[in-house]
A protein has these predicted regions:
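Iron-sulfur-cluster electron-transfer modules
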Residues: 1-48, 52, 216-225, 251, ...
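Ferredoxin-type iron-sulfur electron-transfer modules and their immediate structural context
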Residues: 147, 151-291, 324, 334-353
Length: 355
């Protein structure tokens, strides 16, 4: 409402056009002021945690450079916008008290009124300059920040709700079933199935197993990559990361988003068509070492406040490595061979288990 009023006042030339709402308007403006103060307090808390206390999850390698600058810039921008709002109201309240022309008696200023002693000695002309300057800087700051929003991690304030809504309803820890593999297994186990019933010419191309690049991701996984808040709770809970492994669930989502951005620029350059650039998400952004460090404990999924599932992407990429590249680690191949031959992951027969 406050922003809408500022826009309408700027277009029409009025001042506090919603003042006709009376008591409701006063409650709204007062609530905005309290909210602005709480936002500033929260921002200071977040800044201290990030830059002074230096919590470990904010000091990980993936947050070096532009990611850290982006997070701090957002804090500075929001603080500036809130301070301009309060200073604008402070000057407005003083102008109302002085019965300045065009400044009708409207609004309730519980926070700004405490700042009036800082400017009560200023002339009406100076107060008008302060109020108008803060008005312009406030609206320009909001418009600039809204444009920057789509290029920063702060986009999560728009995407968190839809991402949570579209999150999987499967029990946590349950993996999705690959229908192509299921159909193949059913065909092998069905004694009445005719493997030659479908000719080669009429057969559909086999579905790719797993994920190699972002073009293989589902739209929900793409949404999750942009929803990531980079808070690091997932990485903070990851046992692989805590024991010094290269894996960071947060980095998985950040690298996925970086690759999506790169593919998007490629499509823009080639007029809506993707031209192969010799890169893929698997290998150029996310390494096999990261994938196989995952213990599939699901801690990252449970820790995420906006229902992002890094584990699903990790497992899909593992599936591609194993089923498309035959690149499973030697230890995994040995275990599978033992299960096939001995009915257990250990390298000795069933008859020797009790010895």
């Amino acid at each position: 409402i406050e922003l809408l009023e500022i826009v309408i006042d700027g277009i029409v030339g009025t001042h506090r056009i919603f003042a006709v709402l009376g008591t409701f308007y006063n409650i709204v403006i007062g609530s905005f002021e309290v909210l602005a103060l709480l936002v500033i307090v929260a921002i200071i808390t977040f800044w201290v945690r990030r830059n002074l206390l230096k919590l470990s999850r904010f000091q990980k390698p993936e947050l070096k450079g532009s990611a850290k600058k982006d997070a701090n810039f957002i804090l500075y921008a929001e603080t500036t916008i809130m301070l301009l709002f309060l200073l604008m109201n402070t000057a407005d309240a003083q102008l109302q008290a002085l019965n300045a022309p065009h400044y009708l008696q409207a609004g309730y200023f519980p926070i700004s009124s405490m700042l009036i002693p800082l400017i009560d000695s200023f002339s009406v002309g100076t107060l008008i300059i302060i109020e108008r300057t803060c008005w312009w800087l406030h609206i320009i700051g909001i418009l600039c920040f809204l444009n920057y929003l789509y290029y920063s991690k702060h986009l999560h304030i728009l995407l968190a709700f839809p991402n949570t809504y579209f999150a999987s309803l499967r029990p946590m820890g349950a993996f999705k079933v690959n229908e192509a593999i299921t159909n193949e297994v059913k065909l092998m186990l069905n004694p009445e199935a005719d493997p030659f019933a479908t000719t080669t010419e009429s057969a559909t191309p086999p579905e790719k197993f797993g994920i190699q690049d972002v073009t293989d991701l589902t739209w929900v996984q793409l949404l999750s990559a942009y929803t990531c808040t980079e808070c690091g709770r997932c990485t903070d809970e990851c046992p692989a990361n805590l024991t010094g492994k290269k894996l960071s669930p947060r980095a998985i989502m950040m690298k996925t988003r970086d690759r999506i951005e790169e593919v998007g620029r490629n499509i823009d350059r080639h007029k809506g068509k993707f031209e192969a650039d010799g890169k893929t998400l698997l290998g150029d952004y996310i390494t096999a070492e990261e994938l196989w460090a995952c213990t599939t404990c699901n801690a990252c999924v449970e820790a995420c406040p906006v229902s992002i599932n890094p584990l699903e992407i990790i497992m899909d990429m593992r599936q591609y490595v194993v089923m498309e590249q035959s690149g499973a680690p030697n230890e995994l191949n040995m275990m599978m061979n033992n299960i096939e031959n001995n009915g257990a992951p250990w390298a000795y027969s069933q008859a020797d288990r009790l010895q």
